[in-house]
Amino acid sequence: RVRSSAASVVYKRQELTEGVCGDRIPTFFMRGNHEIRNAYSIGLRDHYDYVGDRTYGSFNWGDTRIVMLDCGEDKPDDHWVYYGLNDFTQLRNEQVDFLKKELSSKEFKKAGKRVLIHHIPLYGNDGKNLCANLWTKLLEKAPFNISLNAHTHKYAYHPKGELGNNYPVIIGGGYKMDGATVMILEKKKDELRVKVLNAKGKILLDITV
């Protein structure tokens, strides 16, 4: 969660990026619902250069297309805890148009591999995703090689077709060390290798997509 000051955000960002050599290797931030909460959450935008100045977007890394979606909060906008201040319905609707354009774009169609990233899973979350009615139809035939998700705080792997998903789905683990995971994607020539490790370095998953 985003605490009360810029200093706390800078400290946390440093803590999270040092381990992946964020001073030398480009690091991309994808927010989840907890990064939307607390006093300084709006200040996060001052610390990151968002692609297209939006919290969702797409870009190429070599011949791999990365598509990032922002699910917003995990509760409806009219939930009492938000005091009428949220409008994530509009944000999700915006991304319907974005997805339609992205999936038909030359950059997407010509990509060697395609990676989808969003915080709240469309599959493997008991249907509790406010984006599902808007995005699932668009994505169910999209030729993604892998989808990377989080939110449930429990690692899971769903092979293509297991839950009606048209691509493999990996859900990252929790924030406590005994359930934490790291996902590593490595592209070599025509192969995209995906590994999931736990905090002890044990390989939980090693697949090529």
Where are these regions (language model features)?
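Structural motif
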Residues: 66-68, 113-117, 148
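Active-site His/acidic residue clusters
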Residues: 126-131
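A short C-terminal boundary segment appended to hydrolase-like catalytic domains
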Residues: 186-209
